[in-house]
Amino acid sequence: MYKVIAQELVGIGGDQRFIGEARKCRFCGTSDPSDFGKKTNAHAFPEGLGNKTLFSLGECCSCNSKFSRYEDALCKAVGPYLTLGGVKGKNGVRQTGRSGSSSVLKHEENQGKRHIQIEARNIEDIHSVIKNNNELLRLRIPIDGDKFVPRYAYKALLKIALSLLPVKEFCSYRQNLECLQEIDDAPGDYPLQVGFSYAWIGNAPPTLGCVILQRNNDTDPVPYIIAIFQAGSVCFQIALRSEEKDRHVQNAVSLSIVWTTQLAKPEGDFFPIEYSSPIQFDWSGLNPQLQPFEAFELTFNAHTTQGAYLPLARRTDQ
């Protein structure tokens, strides 16, 4: 149904790499040398999600400044995952929730060991259930986190996809490119759907990547382009809709690809990373709202000291 037409994979701590055409902005078209900064000015993937090595040569300073608002919204949307996973952004591992709010997640390192600090002031919202002969502890941790603008977060994903989309396809995505220039604009009159999945909460895999998929058969009732972006323990997928290519495709589509990738082992070979079945979000709105997860449930075995987090999605009426 789909074929890969572009992809980039970044390992945390690798060598610097650059994509795009130097001194020609693929987003606004400027080619004035004075409009561009250093080679490392524009991150192809958000720095807040852990990217320190992949940079875009074809992104001018003006566009980079605009896009930073979108990327900030995306990081706020998945803030708990970044904190729990220990993902280091521009200023280290982000704190989820503001000091003084009802719940705060903090990541700390002490003598090379990671620690998660949880502050919760509404203690009645935290409960635990002991099961399996007092071996299994289940702890529900409510999370307020930060508010984000859903449309901005969506446009951060759109920008990532357009950074990798082959230039020959741009003629079909002019509206997508143009909407990035106006902060509140949408790429079209349709729901801005996002498929979200997760893996390894609490220990983010040190990898980021984006894959651009193109429909094989033009008559299939599926989007012409789907972009899948993975960042540590989180994975997103969006459809890049084209008025020309997607006339026969419904506005509301389910983004339900179950994604698996591989992480290289130091000794050779690869370790598979399997993401969950995608949760469907509509990120069309311009009103700020709390990040999409109201709580994380920690299941912890007191004897083996092993545990796992399960995210609990926030109700749509919250």
Each predicted region: which residue ranges?
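Short cysteine-rich clusters marking metal-coordination/redox-active sites
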Residues: 25-28, 60-63
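Histidine-centered nuclease catalytic patch
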Residues: 32-54
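Residues immediately within or flanking Cys/His clusters that coordinate Zn2+
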Residues: 22-25, 38, 57
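Short, flexible, mixed-charge glycine/proline-rich loop motifs
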Residues: 10-22, 49-54
